[in-house]
């Protein structure tokens, strides 16, 4: 989840509200937040950037928890693999130890160069860290400008779409498993009866998976119009390289225009016109067939003779696409 810097995002848990207030006041009082609280950060260097990792004091574990630092490195490597570099030169990652097992409640803030808070259960295992998607999702948020609240779908949609692809490109996720999950989950982004466009219908499914649907359709169309020379990753890198990261406020139209300039085709702007204020329901079954993706139980089978098989491979692997 990306914190709503421009329009008072409603944080849905008391724990997140308290944490946000604590972080805000500590940052007002001191430029060295970790030092103020008596916490010493552990620094990870990845993708040309510095990630300071702090485990909050008083919890059931500390920075030495098995698998924890590898988890941070893997997430940073995934984002770097997709964007070509880590989105911000220096961020702070605050880990909140909680009871139970698993990783949850990640929030990314446009503060101090980039701040991520996330909760980790005391019983979380190295295997849990290795299979996690949430920290990668939060780090992707660093790579897109803050936009108005009615465009929140693009922030969450990009993070939802890019995260599994980034993990595949970093060799941390199996491509067949990735595409199986996309085929399984993307229909949640299709408009339901009574839904409007993405700017007007703000349900969970339309925000996260509707935004991801926009990204997939854009990715396929960019590849189609450029004969697989460019993809959505080029558009998003172009936005980031033009200064469009979480620390700045941009109009969505500006971000899409910059992305289109990076690919040389007006796909993002045209698709936004199609999906922003009215429901649009693409034929996903036909799209999967064109891409050569056949669902087979709990996995998928790839058909490399399909019309857009080369596009599927380019989306999956980027510049390292097997020939």
Listing of model-derived features with the role each one plays in the protein:
Residues 35, 245-323:
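Beta/coil-rich, acidic/histidine-enriched accessory regions frequently appended to metallopeptidases
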Residues 150-213, 219, 224-226, 232, ...:
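Acidic/His/Gly-enriched intrinsically disordered linker/tail segments
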Residues 1-17:
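N-terminal secretory signal peptides that target proteins for export/translocation
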Residues 16-31:
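Bacterial N-terminal signal peptides
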């Amino acid at each position: 989840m990306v914190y709503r810097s421009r329009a008072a995002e409603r944080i849905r848990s008391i724990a997140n509200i308290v944490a946000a207030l604590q972080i805000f006041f500590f940052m007002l009082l001191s430029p060295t937040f970790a030092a103020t609280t008596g916490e010493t950060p552990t620094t990870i260097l990845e993708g040309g950037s510095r990630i300071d990792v702090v485990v909050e004091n008083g919890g059931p574990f500390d920075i030495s928890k098995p698998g924890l630092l590898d988890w941070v490195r893997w997430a940073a490597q995934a984002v770097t693999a997709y964007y070509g570099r880590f989105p911000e030169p220096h961020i702070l990652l605050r880990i909140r130890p909680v009871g139970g097992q698993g990783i949850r409640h990640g929030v990314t803030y446009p503060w101090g160069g980039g701040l991520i808070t996330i909760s980790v259960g005391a019983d979380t295992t190295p295997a849990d860290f290795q299979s996690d998607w949430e920290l990668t999702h939060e780090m992707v948020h660093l790579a897109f400008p803050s936009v108005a609240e009615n465009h929140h779908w693009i922030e969450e949609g990009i993070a939802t779409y890019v995260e599994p692809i980034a993990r595949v490109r970093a060799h941390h996720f199996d491509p067949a498993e990735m595409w199986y999950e996309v085929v399984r989950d993307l229909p949640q982004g299709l408009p339901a009866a009574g839904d409007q466009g993405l700017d007007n219908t703000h349900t969970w499914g339309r925000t996260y998976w509707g935004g991801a649907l926009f990204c997939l359709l854009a990715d396929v169309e960019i590849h189609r119009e450029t004969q697989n020379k460019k993809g959505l990753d080029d558009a998003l890198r172009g936005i980031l390289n033009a200064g469009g990261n979480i620390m700045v406020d941009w109009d969505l139209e500006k971000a899409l225009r910059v992305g289109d300039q990076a690919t040389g085709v007006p796909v993002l702007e045209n698709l936004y016109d199609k999906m922003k204020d009215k429901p649009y329901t693409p034929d996903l079954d036909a799209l999967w067939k064109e891409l050569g993706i056949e669902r087979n139980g709990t996995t998928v089978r790839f058909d490399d003779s399909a019309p857009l098989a080369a596009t599927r491979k380019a989306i999956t692997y980027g510049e390292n696409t097997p020939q």
